[in-house]
Amino acid sequence: FLPLIGKVLSGIL
């Protein structure tokens, strides 16, 4: 579920 968080952060940035 860590990859999901990274994906979200990348989406925000």
UniProtKB/Swiss-Prot annotation:
GO cellular component, one term: extracellular region
Annotated GO biological process: defense response to bacterium; innate immune response
Expression tissues: Expressed by the skin glands.
Primary location class: secreted
Compartments, as annotated in UniProt: Secreted
Keywords: Amidation, Amphibian defense peptide, Antibiotic, Antimicrobial, Immunity, Innate immunity, Secreted
Entry coiled-coil feature ranges: none
Cysteines engaged in disulfide bonds, as pairs: none
Modified residues (Leucine amide): 13
The UniProt record lists the keyword Secreted: yes
Function: Amphipathic alpha-helical antimicrobial peptide with potent activity against Gram-positive bacteria, weak activity against Gram-negative bacteria, and moderate activity against fungi. Also displays anti-leishmania activity by damaging parasite membrane. Stimulates insulin release from pancreatic beta-cells in a dose-dependent manner, without increasing intracellular calcium. Protects beta-cells against cytokine-induced apoptosis and augments beta-cells proliferation. In vivo, intraperitoneal injection together with a glucose load into mice does not have effect on plasma glucose levels.
Family the entry assigns: Belongs to the frog skin active peptide (FSAP) family. Temporin subfamily.
Protein name: Temporin-1Tf
Native source species: Rana temporaria
